[in-house]
Amino acid sequence: MPPKEKDVLVTELESLIEHLSDDNFASSFHFSDELLSLNDLKLLTKKPMFIIANINDKTDENEVLEFQKKISDNIHLVTIDVKLEQDISDLDPNDQADFMDEMGIKESALTRIIRKGYELLGLKTFFTSGPKETRAWAAKKDFNARECSGIIHTDIQKGFIRAETVSYSDYIDNDGEQGSKNSGVWRQEGKDYMVQEGDVIYFRFNI
């Protein structure tokens, strides 16, 4: 590295150290391309982060907003009522949905936490389903069909022919694969197809 570039990098590193010394997160620091290229930094507070805050029915909404203002703009907040979630889990599974509807709860805290984690990591979920098993797979949001097939096995990616797919909602509404085919919602897609959140996929391949 030329001396001039080295001096610039040293100056930026000193600025970063000062930023961190003031109790700031690395995620709120403006990184130059040169600084980002230093893989050895491995700064923990630069990683995607969210805070889970336990609240209850007496929690003042303004307190939550004030807390949100105090943390970095790059850190997200998920609020959950642990006691309420415990009460829901203690109910009979058949009664849980009715209770959640009555309380105006659209999804469980666990679902919201997982969704936020996926959002921050830039992930999406697709499914494979067969006679013995239905399985969820995590993939990067920008992965196409061929790249997603490689998550299951590299041989599938190497011998990729096509992806047969249907949305999760259509799959459920039509009672599975055969019903989806009969209804005309079962599609055939090529290797560049951008897999959508919740797609149910059957990968055709040859090795």
Enumerate the language-model features and the residues they cover.
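C-terminal-of-GTPase-core extension/linker across diverse P-loop GTPases
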Residues: 1-197, 201, 206-207
